[in-house]
Regions:
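Conserved donor-binding/catalytic core segment of Leloir-type glycosyltransferases
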Residues: 178-211
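Conserved acidic donor-binding segment of nucleotide-sugar-dependent glycosyltransferases
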Residues: 296-297, 301-308, 316-322
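Acidic donor-binding loop of glycosyltransferase active sites
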Residues: 250-265, 280
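Nucleotide-activated donor-binding/catalytic signature segment of Leloir-type glycosyltransferases, i.e.
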Residues: 214, 222-248
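A short, well-ordered alpha-helix in the C-terminal region of glycosyltransferases
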Residues: 310, 317, 324-339, 345-351
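Acidic anion/phosphate-binding donor-loop and adjacent secondary structure
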Residues: 145, 165-183, 197, 221
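Nucleotide-sugar-dependent
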Residues: 244, 258-274, 287, 291-292
Length: 356
C-alpha cells in the first residue's frame, strides 16, 4: 500500500485535551478527524493552535476576524510543509480558499462543505472558483446539486460521501432479534434545524411516552438548547447528556423521531444514523438534506415537513407493527456496518487524497 500523503488537517474548534483518553475508555464515540489523522499521518491544528501561534498575523486575524480566520491563515502559512490541506468545514474552508487563491496555491485543498445553500455562501463560493480545490466533500445529494448546478463547481471535484459515525460505540446492547421493538418510549434527539413544535403537536394526541434530548451534539459544544419543545404529561425533555446516557436512551427506545425543517443540508442526519446504528427504525421529516439516508418503508417512515398529523400516524404505525419495526431496525444496523461509519469515510478520504 502506498504511503499516504502528509496532510495538515484544520479543525475549526478546540479539541479537548483528554478526548483520546475518553474515547479509549469507551466514554465517547470515535471522531472522524482523529481517525483521519491516524490513517493519513496528518497533523491537526485547531483553535488551540491559533491561540498558541507565534505568528503575530495569525493572532491578529483571530482577534479581529475570528478564530476560523486565524486558523485559515495558520494553514496558509504552513502550506509548503504538506502535500495536502484538509479542512473539516466551510467555516475555515472558505477563508482558506480566499488565502490560497491569492497565493496561487492550487489543487491541493480538500474541504468538507456541510451547507453551501445560503445567499452569502453561494455568492462567495461562485466568486472564488474551483482552482484551489483538490476536492469538495458534501454529505447529501441536495448539497451536491447546489455546489455543481448553482455554485458552478466542476462535478468531478465535488465528492458526495456518507456521514461518518462510530458504529462500534453505537451498537445494540442486546441480540438483534431482542432489541429493535423492545422499548417502551419514543426518542427524539438533536438541535440543528429541528421542528419540535410539530413533534409536540403529534405527541399530544398519542398515548406513548416521549423522551426528547433537545440540545447540540456534545455536552461540551456550548450550543444553546433547542426551543419549541416543552415537557408535558407524556413528554420528558433532557439536555446536554453524556454520550453514554444518550446511547442508553437509544438502546431503550422503540423508535426514533427526527423532526426537521425544510433545509437542503443534512440537518438531523447524525441522530438518524446513530439511531440506525442502534438498530432502531426512524420517523423523519422529508427534508431534502436527509433523503439520502432514510428510505421510506425500508429504514423508517418519511413524513411531510411540518405535518403533525402525518408524523402522528407514522409513529403509531411503527409502534403498532413490532415485526415491521424489527425488520427496519435490522436493515438499518446492517447498512450502518456496511456504509455509514467512520471507517468507511476515512478510507474514502484516504483514497481521494492518495490521488492528489
Amino acid at each position: 500500500m502506498p504511503t499516504p500523503p502528509r496532510v495538515l488537517l484544520l479543525l475549526a474548534k478546540k479539541r479537548p485535551a483528554d478526548l483520546e483518553a475518553r474515547i479509549a475508555a469507551g466514554e465517547e464515540p470515535e471522531v472522524e478527524y482523529l481517525a483521519l489523522a491516524r490513517r493519513l499521518g496528518a497533523e491537526i491544528v485547531d483553535f488551540h493552535s491559533v491561540e498558541a501561534s507565534s505568528s503575530r498575523a495569525v493572532r491578529w486575524a483571530a482577534r479581529r476576524l475570528g478564530l476560523a480566520w486565524g486558523l485559515a491563515l495558520l494553514g496558509a502559512q504552513r502550506r509548503r510543509e504538506f502535500a495536502h490541506l484538509y479542512a473539516t468545514g466551510e467555516d475555515v474552508g472558505i477563508p482558506l480558499v480566499m488565502l490560497l487563491r491569492a497565493l496561487r496555491w492550487h489543487e491541493r485543498l480538500t474541504v468538507v462543505i456541510h451547507n453551501a445553500d445560503t445567499p452569502k455562501r453561494r455568492r462567495l463560493l461562485r466568486a472564488l472558483g474551483h482552482r484551489a480545490y483538490h476536492a469538495v466533500i458534501c454529505l447529501s445529494a441536495a448539497q451536491e446539486r447546489v455546489l455543481v448546478d448553482t455554485v458552478g463547481l466542476p462535478a468531478a471535484k465535488v465528492k458526495r460521501m456518507r456521514l461518518w459515525m462510530d458504529h462500534r460505540f453505537y451498537r445494540p446492547s442486546r441480540a438483534a432479534g431482542e432489541n429493535e421493538a423492545a422499548g417502551d418510549y419514543v426518542l427524539s434527539i438533536g438541535m440543528e434545524s429541528r421542528d419540535y413544535p410539530t413533534l409536540q403537536a403529534a405527541a399530544a394526541e398519542l398515548p406513548y411516552r416521549f423522551h426528547v434530548v433537545a440540545s447540540g451534539w456534545s455536552p461540551t459544544a456550548g450550543f444553546t438548547a433547542a426551543g419549541g419543545i416543552q415537557g408535558g404529561a407524556n413528554i420528558t425533555v433532557e439536555r446536554n447528556l453524556p454520550y453514554a446516557r444518550l446511547r442508553e436512551l437509544y438502546d431503550g427506545c422503540r423508535l426514533v423521531v427526527v423532526p426537521v425543517k425544510r433545509v437542503s443540508y443534512a440537518a438531523g442526519v447524525t441522530g438518524i444514523c446513530e439511531a440506525m446504528a442502534m438498530g432502531k427504525p426512524v420517523v423523519a421529516s422529508a427534508s431534502p438534506g436527509i433523503l439520502d439516508y432514510v428510505e421510506d418503508g425500508v429504514s423508517g417512515r418519511l413524513v411531510p415537513v411540518g405535518d403533525a398529523g402525518a408524523m402522528r400516524g407514522a409513529i403509531a404505525a411503527l409502534w403498532d407493527d413490532p415485526d415491521g419495526a424489527r425488520a427496519m431496525g435490522r436493515h438499518n444496523r446492517v447498512w450502518v456496518e456496511a456504509e455509514i461509519n467512520t471507517d468507511a469515510y476515512v478510507e474514502q478520504v484516504a483514497r481521494l487524497l492518495g490521488s492528489a
